[in-house]
Amino acid sequence: MQHLVFVYGTLRHGESNHTYLQHSQLLGQFETKPEYALYDLGAYPGLVEGHQSVHGEVYLVDEHTLAQLDILEDVPVEYRRDTIETPFGTAWIYIYQETHRLHSLIDSGDWCQRV
């Protein structure tokens, strides 16, 4: 079975964990509706509900890759999977759950443009 996944941080092209998606198909860039907030947690970002648009990419992944992403994202402890509507269809999105660690908002909503 194939799944769509929206990625917004270290899984994006050129970022440190992109190798997890090396055999997956990039469907395109996507900017969410202003329903989220993106925080810099140091080595990676955390996305939570908010009032900001977040930039990312949508990939077509297989079951094995999705399972590997769940392990990487520490589902269901650190992140949980939810769905988001994209121009490519309904995609999985990883929502950060450890809100006590949120301190540094990424104003641009783009992990790749953080300062």
Curated annotation (Swiss-Prot):
GO terms for cellular component: cytosol. Substrate binds at Y8, G9, T10, L11. One of its GO terms (molecular function) is gamma-glutamylaminecyclotransferase activity. Coiled coil: none annotated. It comes from the Bacteria. CDD domains: GGCT_like (cd06661). Putative gamma-glutamylcyclotransferase. PANTHER family: GAMMA-GLUTAMYLAMINECYCLOTRANSFERASE, TROPONIN C-AKIN-1 PROTEIN. This is Putative gamma-glutamylcyclotransferase VC_2546.
